[in-house]
Amino acid sequence: MDLYMIVLLSLCGLLRAQETTDTISLDNCCEDGKKRGLESQDCSSLPLISESTTCRVVQEQCCSAVLEDSICTSGINMAKDQSSCDALLSGSSTCETKTTKMCCECCLLGSSRCRIRVSPVSSVCRWSISRGPGVRSCCVDKQPAHGVQPSKGDAQNTEDQCRAAGCAQRCLNGTCSCLDGFKLKTDGKHCEDINECLLGPHHCVTGERCINTLGSYRCQREISCGTGYELTDNNKCKDIDECDLGTHNCAAEMECQNTAGSFRCRPRMQCAAGFIQDALGSCIDINECVSVTALSRGQMCFNTVGSFICQRHSVTCGRGYHLNAEGTRCVDIDECAGPDNSCDGHGCINLVGSYRCECRTGFIFNSISRSCEDIDECRNYPGRLCAHKCENILGSYKCSCTAGFKLADDGRNCDDVNECESSPCSQGCANVYGSYQSYCRRGYQLSDADGITCEDIDECALPTGGHICSYRCHNTPGSFHCTCPASGYTLAANGRSCQDIDECLTGTHSCSESESCFNIQGGFRCLSFDCPANYRRSGDTRPRVDRADIIRCVKSCQHNDISCVLNPILSHSHTAISLPTFREFNKPEEIVFLRSPTPTHLPHMDSPEIVYDILEGNIQNSFDIIKRLDHGMIVGVVKQVRPLVGPVRTVLKLAMNYVTNGVVSHRNIINVRIYVSEFWF
């Protein structure tokens, strides 16, 4: 059964259930869908030719059927032309490509059934066979017409020609051709995509941009639809119905009306007579008295809710007048008549419609309140009446002085008071203009409580007290004094710093004659430097060792001692340093410098490279060694990179390696005895 008839019959139930007055038949709907499918239009967004939902479904199904037949026919033609589906758009995974390949492979199965008479393949290619007689014809076309059997040699010859041609897509009698949307390359075998956008055979209209695809193209809109519109699947702009979607902002008493690209809010109700509608749709009263002009003489307009009324005008007298006895006119009021007049004890003068008060000294008449008011002399004449403070009183003013002054005999100026005559301060007093200042002797400060009592300054407790004395600070009344550790230090001449006692220099050490005295901060150490076997001491034996002294043991081999000669260590050096416990360790401290001249560049050998290393004694990884060049010298710099809190003792074993071509030719060992004091000074 034809696919289009299947579509029409499957929709019969829907037709019976749907009442419509549409005059367009389902055949017309299907024919329109088939036409648009032949034009390769998008079947999911076809222009409607009827308001009927059934017609729209028939359009889409008939359009899809035409597209599917076209896609399947391409696969069947490839199978017939090339007897192979391998070259079908290799690597593509689109739905169209999969359908084309499936129909191609099912056609090959149908052809094989005819040649080798295998079991029917209808169960395997059921969907492809339902596409029409195309797949079934793959077997039928192989049968000879009118009962004449084709020559086996002719069929074999055609198949051999296509196999030898090596066509990429289609082959007919050894001649290659391409699918729709492709063209044959100059080699006559392979196919390349046709760029419809570049060559011009596309259907994109003005405002759409053509985008080339493999074997086809698509049209994309270039300009957005703008506010109030949305882009549909068929690349068209459609008005957004804000009223239907509920995206409008109309108030509850307003009704939303959709317009092209926008919407309007219209009032739901009409206002009664005497009312007008505001911007929010509410009915508000009209004040008719603002616009009414046809009033009779002697009448007044009074606005009411939704209307207005007219009343006869009555006689009203202004301020300072009252109605006469007849009630026909206004006459003056004598405000000064009687003992209780309006001037409240001041002189009163009656005027027509008013009055005026004759005020006493220190008062002024207020024409608005019609009364005598006190004159504030202090505010009217600031700084001109009193030297310090001015206080207004009823009808006059008086002067006063600030603290530290007393009023002069003239009642306006102020004289300074000498407060020091009463000895208010505990130590010293200095009179100043209008006050006094207490001061204290050195080592004392004024109390924050009263500002006159002198209190002892605890210099040791001040924020900088930790820096006043090197070791310990002891407060005394009005002063302080510093002390140093019980041994190893003495107080300097400034009375604050602690100086180390050099026991080695003063001879107060206890080292034997075979030992060397080394002074450290706060003490001394007796050091004994012994050279290892096959090494001898270089230089004289010293009774004391300074920081810069280095005791060296150089290699001295016995005759024919091969192991000694081959030993790469040329020397063992000893030195000692004393370090404080750094109070503020903010950056690495350079403590030891190992200097060596730059190796001489000999013409017959490579110059060795000096490499420094820490072998032992690097407690807590507190030390590091780097190499740098300084004035033609290679310097190994030992740095303290982490703080150490004394007392700490360690022996830092350093190696100075001479490396030539990656091999250590010889090395020098340096033993540095490090003593870290528990104090920072």
Swiss-Prot record:
GO biological process: embryonic medial fin morphogenesis; extracellular matrix organization; mesenchymal cell migration; skin morphogenesis
Annotated function: Incorporated into fibronectin-containing matrix fibers. May play a role in cell adhesion and migration along protein fibers within the extracellular matrix (ECM). Could be important for certain developmental processes and contribute to the supramolecular organization of ECM architecture, in particular to those of basement membranes.
Cross-referenced InterPro entries: Anaphylatoxin/fibulin, cEGF, EGF-like_Ca-bd_dom, EGF-like_dom, EGF-type_Asp/Asn_hydroxyl_site, EGF_Ca-bd_CS, Fibulin-1, Fibulin_C
Similarity remark: Belongs to the fibulin family.
Keywords annotated in UniProt: Calcium, Disulfide bond, EGF-like domain, Extracellular matrix, Glycoprotein, Repeat, Secreted, Signal
Segments forming domain Anaphylatoxin-like: 29-63, 68-107, 108-139
Keyword Disulfide bond recorded: yes
Designated name of the protein: Fibulin-1
A Gene Ontology molecular function term of the record: peptidase activator activity
Gene3D superfamilies: Laminin
Domain EGF-like, chain residue ranges per copy: 158-192, 193-238, 239-284, 285-331, 332-373, 374-415, 416-455, 456-499, 500-554
Lineage: Eukaryota, Metazoa, Chordata, Craniata, Vertebrata
Coiled coil regions in record: none
